[in-house]
Amino acid sequence: MSLGSLAFTLFLTVVAGIKCNGTEVCAGSPGIPGTPGNHGLPGRDGRDGIKGDPGPPGPMGPPGGMPGLPGRDGLPGAPGAPGEHGDKGEPGERGLPGFPAYLDEELQTASYEIKHQILQTMGVLSLQGSMLSVGDKVFSTNGQSVNFDTIREMCTRAGGHIAAPRNPEENEAIASITKKYNTYPYLGVIEGQTPGDFHYLDGASVNYTNWYPGEPRGRGKEKCVEMYTDGKWNDKGCLQYRLAICEF
């Protein structure tokens, strides 16, 4: 069918569906609904409404967390200015009366006599070879032979220390007692952690030595020091029995 014939057929179909009344007003049948149009542009905002009444109170919220720990103390402040001098105190109580002058003289006399007796005793002991005085030191022995720790304890109990010569004069005094008893004594000198490093019992470094040639050679195994009768030193173990000589 040609395009013109198709158009004519559709025209007849439409005309056939039209009804006319006596006044020449024709009413056609409803056509097929068209496709929906596109959405229009948004309208303008309306005016604000009237303010509403306040709402009811809300429920109580949960309690907050626990209190935190106290903070650290702050730094000390600067020292304050010195205060004013206080008032003078009341006089103290009267002291005890002093000794009469004659008693003071008697005390001086007694002190002199005691010193004289001590010097006499020291002289007797020196003649016996059991005690010698050199400078401000006194070297003494009781003639016993014991190990190093026992000698140290004996001397400490007597208020002294194991004899430790710090110069040739003191070394000779100890050697004199050694010859008298013909027994080697221990000296107040010991070896430290480092082999060959010797020091006095108070920790001070040794400032005087009189080693026998080739000594010390214990190399850390002989911690104590003994003296020969000629005054020479030798490193030795500390468990031997040696003459106890103390210094005061």
UniProtKB/Swiss-Prot annotation:
It is found in: Secreted; Secreted, Extracellular space, Extracellular matrix; Secreted, Extracellular space, Surface film. The modification 4-hydroxyproline is found at residues 30, 33, 36, 42, 54, 57, 63, 67, 70, 76. In presence of calcium ions, it binds to surfactant phospholipids and contributes to lower the surface tension at the air-liquid interface in the alveoli of the mammalian lung and is essential for normal respiration. Enhances the expression of MYO18A/SP-R210 on alveolar macrophages. Residues 28-100 are annotated as: Disordered. PANTHER family: C-TYPE LECTIN DOMAIN FAMILY 11 MEMBER A (PTHR22799:SF1), TETRANECTIN-RELATED (PTHR22799). GO terms for cellular component: collagen trimer; collagen-containing extracellular matrix; extracellular region. It comes from the Eukaryota. Residues 54-65 have a biased composition (Pro residues). Disulfide bonds join 155-246, 224-238. One of its GO terms (molecular function) is carbohydrate binding. It comes from Mus musculus (Mouse). Residues 132-248 form the C-type lectin domain. Residues 28-100 form the Collagen-like domain. Belongs to the SFTPA family. Residues 42-51, 84-93 have a biased composition (Basic and acidic residues). This is Pulmonary surfactant-associated protein A. Residues 1-20 form the signal peptide. One of its GO terms (biological process) is respiratory gaseous exchange by respiratory system. Pulmonary surfactant consists of 90% lipid and 10% protein. There are 4 surfactant-associated proteins: 2 collagenous, carbohydrate-binding glycoproteins (SP-A and SP-D) and 2 small hydrophobic proteins (SP-B and SP-C). Residues 69-82 have a biased composition (Low complexity). Ca(2+) binds at residues 215, 217, 234-235. The keyword ATP-binding does not apply. Glycans are attached at residues 21, 207.
